[in-house]
């Protein structure tokens, strides 16, 4: 599938280049158009609504912000909930509350090629701001034989 994504990306860049020559856009319009193409391709990395363990509500079409919740019994797997790829930088604040009856659930955040996993504090809370710089950036919930509830919100940090 990586070869297919690369072929689609290259075709999109060629088509965009041809359109841009005819349109004579500003530099910002070129960046915005390229960012849109990169973002659309990156959506394949986000778990589809129908495949989610939990339930996600995005704010409009923005895949970086919204809310997510799940109530689980012995669940295993991973939900890639928020994020995408972009040439633009974003500062995202994630708030996660995990109430565990058994098993484990954690927040995993990918920023570019760096992947880190975060556990809750003694109150079951994770609250952290991330710099989502250009590239692929995703917030995920990882379930390991988890019984309990998860709530997460993602918003732009000030």
What positions do the PLM features span?
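Transition segment at domain starts
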Residues: 25-84
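Short, solvent-exposed loop/turn segments in extracellular or other extracytoplasmic domains
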Residues: 77, 120-127
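Short, surface-exposed beta-strand/strand-loop-strand elements in extracellular ectodomains
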Residues: 101-118
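Edge beta-strands of jelly-roll/beta-sandwich modules across compartments, strongly enriched
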Residues: 143-158
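Extracellular and analogous surface-interaction loops
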Residues: 74, 81-92, 129-134
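Hydrophobic membrane-insertion alpha-helices, especially the h-region
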Residues: 6-20
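A short beta-strand element within beta-rich, extracytoplasmic domains
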Residues: 90-100
